[in-house]
Amino acid sequence: MRRQRERKSMPDAVKKVYLIHGWGANRHMFDDLMPRLPATWPVSAVDLPGHGDAPFAQPFDIEAAADAVAAQIDTPADILGWSLGGLVALYLAARHPDKVRSLCLTASFARLTAAEDYPEGLAAPALGKMVGAFRSDYAKHIKQFLQLQLLHTPDADGIIGRILPDLARCGTPSALQEALDAAERADARHLLDKIDVPVLLVFGGKDAITPPRMGEYLHRHLKGSRLVVMEKAAHAPFLSHAEAFAALYRDFVEGV
């Protein structure tokens, strides 16, 4: 795990923010969000193992990914995780509580696939159909994914133009497959009652990948959490509703 992009703070900054991307992406997914966060915050966006420029020398493991992020943190930090990155953030908070001051989980999950005791999850065929497109032609489908997320968003073409060239460098194919397999196997529900930090949950009302019911499950099981559903957003609220998302997150962190 490498800390790839870091924005230095002003001398009086006291908050450290770490941004953790989702499957099939890399740190550049946050390129449009970072400038909207307070200039006094030191913000680091990381690449998960095998994604972006991060090396991949072992099977992808959610717990190991969380440990790698923890190794970069020297004082309790505010963690924002998107999709798979939110799952990593849950493991980080449970395994390294001394490293986490607050959590923001956006379009994320404790478990991705449905089970008898977890109807909130996705049916396996639906999940397979969604990820199959990315496997067949990543560059094509990541652009289509962004276009769908930013539908009706002002300057959508500009946002896509800024982040797509770097985002399309998706990383190691074997790592992406292993990360997907790990996400499908993972079940962090048993960790939720161990997490004792402020939690903000932000979901998109139109998200078909991690629908709001997954956020409702997290909200019920993470004590003291706050759930916000952006009704017109889909799987990337921090892109499609960047200003509103940044303001929401800023107020949350400032209030911790």
From Swiss-Prot:
Primary location recorded for the protein, binned into one broad class: cytoplasm
Keywords: Biotin biosynthesis, Cytoplasm, Hydrolase, Serine esterase
Localization of this protein: Cytoplasm
Gene Ontology biological process terms from the UniProt entry: biotin biosynthetic process
Reaction(s) the record says it catalyses: 6-carboxyhexanoyl-[ACP] methyl ester + H2O = 6-carboxyhexanoyl-[ACP] + methanol + H(+)
Domain of life: Bacteria
Binding site for substrate: 23, 83-84, 145-149, 235
Domain AB hydrolase-1 as annotated: residue spans: 17-241
Record: active site: 83 (nucleophile), 207, 235
Leading EC class: hydrolase
Family annotation (Pfam families): Abhydrolase_1
EC number(s) stated in the UniProt entry for this protein: 3.1.1.85
Cellular-component GO terms for this entry: cytoplasm; membrane
UniProt pathway: Cofactor biosynthesis; biotin biosynthesis
MF GO annotations: pimelyl-[acyl-carrier protein] methyl ester esterase activity
Disulfide bonds: none
HAMAP family in alphabetical order: Carboxylester
Family from the record: Belongs to the AB hydrolase superfamily. Carboxylesterase BioH family.
Main function: The physiological role of BioH is to remove the methyl group introduced by BioC when the pimeloyl moiety is complete. It allows to synthesize pimeloyl-ACP via the fatty acid synthetic pathway through the hydrolysis of the ester bonds of pimeloyl-ACP esters.
Assembly mode: Monomer.
Name of the protein in question: Pimeloyl-[acyl-carrier protein] methyl ester esterase
